[in-house]
């Protein structure tokens, strides 16, 4: 990993530990706690990634006669190093999200519904229409769930095609995006459209049931293994869809497919994620801003212009 990238990587870990410190202090003050089995599993998974990182570091130092082979292992190592910090930050960020929910600010749900109405959008009508078309419901459900799969597939693609700097940029985008949406949602909390409109089909209101429980103080114990996404405004799924496609921009034949899949994922957030149209539109704006800021400010300062050109653009 180039010196400038190592500095950015170190900064990512510093930010993660800073948020962890905030989590610990805040949790101690309000009696918030983590269920032990979830913590144990999280630690085990993190340790597993660290072990893989160590093995890859050793392999990447082997003096292979084939230079391409040596470079391949170095790119795989870089991808796993960034994956490790992102996985760790994800858990720390989830706790921060739940802590913010406990602040119990007045709900902004009606403001978002009013904004939707001003645009001529009525969420229940769209939901019922999608439900009346099983093939469309299945396609949108698949696209929505692809978000989690892409978190694992994208680093593999970028490692194999030697575009690991693009993956590093994506991880920074992920961290900035997650922090941004949580901070925005702090003074503007909103219950999911599933909850507001009383939708109790499978994988609807049950996926955001923690919102009311932690908001009202009925529980203060979180199982990290069963954590839910509780931020409605803006939509993190929408932001990540933009970042996913952008991360694959230098992988020639995969990029068009990434655009199509993530465009469908953005549409799916309305009915599969229980988001209001205001959530999605704000997510599009926030996503564009995050990509621009990370690229033009954070990443440009960390990596000289000459190094920002991918070493290989392959299919």
Locate each region found by the language model:
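Interfacial segments of alpha-helical transmembrane regions
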Residues: 78-83, 152-189, 194-200
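Interfacial helix-loop-helix junctions of multi-pass membrane proteins
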Residues: 192-195, 232, 264-290
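Membrane-interfacial catalytic/cofactor-binding modules of polytopic membrane enzymes
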Residues: 183-250
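Aromatic-anchored segments of alpha-helical transmembrane domains
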Residues: 18-27, 178-186, 262-271
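Membrane-interfacial, low-structure loops and terminal tails that flank and connect transmembrane helices
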Residues: 1-5, 62-76, 301-315
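Membrane-interfacial alpha-helical segments at the cytosolic side of multi-pass membrane proteins
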Residues: 153-160, 238-255, 285-296
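N-terminal membrane topogenic signal
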Residues: 1-17
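N-terminal transmembrane-helix/juxtamembrane module of multi-pass inner/ER membrane proteins
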Residues: 6-10, 21-48, 84-151
